[in-house]
Design a protein with these regions (language model features):
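Residue-level signature of outer-membrane beta-barrel architecture
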Residues: 6-9, 22, 66, 125-127, ...
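Gram-negative outer-membrane beta-barrel transporters
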Residues: 80-82, 100-182
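Membrane-embedded beta-barrel scaffold of Gram-negative outer-membrane proteins
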Residues: 15-17, 21, 25-27, 31, ...
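Short beta-alpha connecting loops at secondary-structure transitions
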Residues: 44-50
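Outer-membrane beta-barrel translocator domains and adjoining extracellular loop/strand segments
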Residues: 29-35, 42-44, 86-93, 133-135, ...
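Transmembrane beta-barrel architecture of outer membranes
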Residues: 3, 47, 171-175
């Protein structure tokens, strides 16, 4: 699928990157198979969906990176993603199938379209700026803020709720680690 990647070396320590990409994610084969899996012990049924469409996304990213003279960097970026036909598991209760009622029914569905916008910040630095003996010890941390909004939510029995966020898309994520080399 098409993509455009641009990098501008402002100077030796400062880089700006931008990109547009289109990506396609096909459904898992197990989700496409028109199979029926009945778990009698829990009275659950799972049915595949051969009608699933691939998820297509249009992605715009812009970032700026500053590299320290010693090992490390600070980076900030923004992103926007338009996602079409994302897939989630639709779960229903008291579902009737071939004359039996099951307490839980699960089937993958194309749930609709979503827009995602966010900010990413990251920082990595060894501690040699404190003391040269600490050149093999460092810190790495990231923070991401994401706002998502689902449009055209396609679930049976549910209305398109206002300001519904995309499933599996947390608003805040962060990671931090200390590292050392041997």
């Amino acid at each position: 699928l098409p993509s455009l990647l641009v990098k501008w070396n402002v100077n030796d320590d400062f880089k700006v990157r931008g990109s547009f990409t289109q990506t396609l994610s096909r459904p898992k084969y197990s989700a496409l198979v028109p199979s029926v899996n009945i778990k009698r012990s829990d009275n659950e049924i799972t049915i595949g969906n051969p009608e699933l469409k691939p998820t297509v996304s249009y992605n715009f990213d812009l970032s700026a990176d500053y590299y320290f003279r010693s090992i490390g960097l600070i980076s900030a970026g923004i992103f926007y993603k338009k996602i079409d036909d994302f897939i989630v598991d639709q779960v229903s209760t008291n579902y009737e199938y071939q004359g039996n009622t099951y307490t839980r029914f699960t089937q993958p569905k194309n749930a609709g379209n979503a827009n995602l916008v966010g900010v990413e910040l990251s920082y990595q630095r060894d501690f040699s700026f404190i003391a040269p003996a600490l050149k093999c010890v460092g810190f790495y941390g990231t923070y991401t803020y994401t706002h998502s909004r689902v449009e055209d939510f396609n679930f049976e029995g549910r209305e398109n709720e206002k300001d519904l966020s995309m499933p599996g898309s947390p608003e805040h994520t962060a990671n931090a680690s200390l590292y050392f080399c041997l």
